Amino acid sequence: MIYLKKNDYQNAIKYLSNFKSNDIMLSSISIGSIGDAFSELNQYEEAYEFYTKAHEVSENNYTTPIYLFKSAIVALELGKFSSAYDNFTKIKYEYSESLQAKNIDVYISKAEALK
């Protein structure tokens, strides 16, 4: 994680890819952090892949809405408007108490308009 904080994204990807944990929250965060590194490198296809893995590895009220949101934002960048819409809608209905649900209707409307 220190490499990510120091903007050394290649090393962040390298070391986080080797990270293994039985803790599902830590696994989700490490996978999502790889997505963050790829996103910072403007490698959006890879970022999308890792954000999707991160929210699928463990459905929970903490990490799932974070990585659903990040996945949806990158999906918009990639022109995957239906995927973005689905993820934003899932946040609205399944994670309505999350921070990511705040103003989610704006994002849903944007994705819907672009579909």
Residue ranges and their predicted role:
Residues 6, 18-28, 57-63, 91-102:
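Short solvent-exposed coil/turn linkers within tandem alpha-helical repeat scaffolds
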